[in-house]
Amino acid sequence: MNFIVYPALDIRNGAVVRLQQGDYARQTRYDDQVLPRAQAFADSGATWMHLVDLDAAKAGGYTLAPLLRQITRATGLQVQTGGGVRSRDDVARILDAGAARVVIGSLAVRQMTCVIEWLQAFGPERITVALDTRQDAGGVWRLPVHGWTEVAEATLEALAQQYAAAGLRHLLCTDIARDGMLSGPNMDVYAYLRALVPAVQIQVSGGARDVADVVAAKMAGCAGIVLGKALLEGRLALKEAVQHGSVADPGDPLPCGELTEPVCRYRSV
C-alpha cells in the first residue's frame, strides 16, 4: 500500500478558504488562485489532491465540475472530491467530470443503505466515505451531523464495521476537535480504526501541522493524510511532506493486534 499525501483545497464562492472546526462563521479566506495552487501541488510531487465544495456541502448540488475538469486536465492530478453529494446521479456526474474518487460525508451517516448501493455500483475505488467524529464523555466516538449540531444514533465503530463488511476500501476520518486547529492529528482514533477495520484504507484528516504528523500517520499504517491549513499558511512544505510520505518504512507498521490493546478504551459499549 502506497502512502498518499492529499493536499487539500476547500472552495467557497470561488475562493480558497478554511473553516475552523467546520464553522462557516469562522472562515479564513486566502485567495481565488485555485488552479495555480493545484498546479503547485503537482509541481511539488503530489499525485492526488482533496477538493471540497463548501457551498454544496451547505446547500447541496456540487458546483465544482468545471473547475475539476480544469484541474485534472492541466495538472494530471488525481482528485478525490465531494460536498453536497445527495444522489447516485451526483456521484455519476462528479466521476464524469474527472474525479478519481467521490467523497460522501453526511449522507454516509444518514443513508447508509444508499451509499452502500453506490459503493457496489461504482466500485470501491471510486468512493471515499468521510466520517466526522467527536469523542463523548464516556469515550465513545460519536458522529455529529447537520453541521455538527446533532449527533447520529450510530457510532463510528458501528458504521465503520458495516461499511467494511459492504466492501468499503477508502475511509477518511476527521476528529472534529482537531480540525483546523494545527494541534496534530489524534492518532488514537486512527489506530483504533485500523485495528477495527484492517481491510479498509484509512485517511487521516484534521490537525496536521508538520512532517512529523505525516510520518506518524504513515507509521501507524494509515493509507494517507489530508493536509490543509498547514500548507495554506506555509507551516509545512508539500514537497517535504510528499518525500517523507514516500520513503520506505524501516519495517512494517505494527500488526493490528498490537494496536488493539492501547485503544480498546475507545470502543463503544
UniProtKB/Swiss-Prot annotation:
Position of the signal peptide: none
Keyword Isomerase: yes
CC annotations in GO: cytoplasm
Pfam families: His_biosynth
Keywords of this entry: Amino-acid biosynthesis, Cytoplasm, Histidine biosynthesis, Isomerase
Catalyzed chemical reaction(s): 1-(5-phospho-beta-D-ribosyl)-5-[(5-phospho-beta-D-ribosylamino)methylideneamino]imidazole-4-carboxamide = 5-[(5-phospho-1-deoxy-D-ribulos-1-ylimino)methylamino]-1-(5-phospho-beta-D-ribosyl)imidazole-4-carboxamide
Subcellular location: Cytoplasm
Pathway listed: Amino-acid biosynthesis; L-histidine biosynthesis; L-histidine from 5-phospho-alpha-D-ribose 1-diphosphate: step 4/9
Catalytic activity, EC: 5.3.1.16
InterPro entries per the UniProt record, alphabetical: Aldolase_TIM (IPR013785), His_biosynth (IPR006062), HisA_bact_arch (IPR006063), Isoase_HisA-like (IPR044524), Isoase_HisA-like_bact (IPR023016), RibuloseP-bd_barrel (IPR011060)
Family statement: Belongs to the HisA/HisF family.
Name the UniProt record assigns to this protein: 1-(5-phosphoribosyl)-5-[(5-phosphoribosylamino)methylideneamino] imidazole-4-carboxamide isomerase
Organism: Xylella fastidiosa (strain Temecula1 / ATCC 700964)
High-level lineage: Bacteria, Pseudomonadati, Pseudomonadota, Gammaproteobacteria, Lysobacterales
